[in-house]
């Protein structure tokens, strides 16, 4: 069977998706291995449309079944911002975290928030299935933890009261928005959402 393409150049996302798909019994490949970068515009109105666009474009270009995601952080005090613009709030992860804290400084705490993730699986003929997941918590004022990426060091997950950067990868990959989106995708596939999909019913976690 041809490999499944993970369509991201974000090394943190790539690592998580590889771990979440590890027991699927599939060969996995990625954009770095294939030398592909279509510079897909991530300017859609919502996470579904952006994940759909990335997955379908890379599936068509590669001829491979392709999985892609789009994720955003929604903060209640900022009326759901940065949302789909989370990755474009500033130039890199540290400056994005600093900018978010700057924007929140004038608002009373707690700064409740949630990550939302859409995962799209696309076939080379244009067929697509989507999964969605979220993870609730709040933004904290000081970075904590050495793991994770993005906003993880300032996002305290509601159930554990630890930031996502404080969680071991195995634990994060059981409760994160991305893990829940992949679980949701697999559940939809098990109900026949995408006949011929290379992915199996839910067994990860």
Name what the model sees in each region.
Residues 2-5, 11-205:
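Anionic-ligand binding patches
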């Amino acid at each position: 069977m041809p490999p499944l393409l993970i369509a991201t150049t974000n090394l943190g996302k790539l690592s998580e998706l590889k771990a979440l798909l590890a027991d699927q019994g599939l060969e996995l490949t990625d954009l770095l291995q294939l030398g592909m970068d279509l510079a897909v515009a991530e300017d859609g109105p919502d996470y579904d449309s952006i994940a759909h666009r990335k997955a379908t474009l890379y599936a068509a270009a590669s001829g491979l079944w392709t999985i892609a995601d789009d994720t955003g952080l929604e903060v209640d005090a900022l009326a759901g911002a940065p949302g789909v613009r989370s990755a474009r709030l500033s130039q890199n992860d540290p400056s994005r975290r600093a900018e978010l804290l700057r924007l929140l400084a004038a608002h009373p705490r707690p700064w409740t928030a949630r990550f939302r993730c859409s995962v799209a699986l696309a076939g080379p003929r244009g067929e697509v299935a989507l999964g969605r997941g979220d993870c609730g918590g709040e933004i904290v004022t000081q970075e904590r933890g050495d793991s994770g990426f993005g906003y993880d060091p300032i996002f305290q997950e509601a159930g554990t009261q630890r930031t996502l950067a404080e969680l071991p990868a195995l634990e994060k990959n059981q409760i994160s928005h991305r893990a829940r989106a992949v679980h949701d995708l697999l559940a939809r596939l098990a109900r026949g959402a995408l006949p011929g999909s290379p992915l199996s019913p839910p067994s990860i976690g």
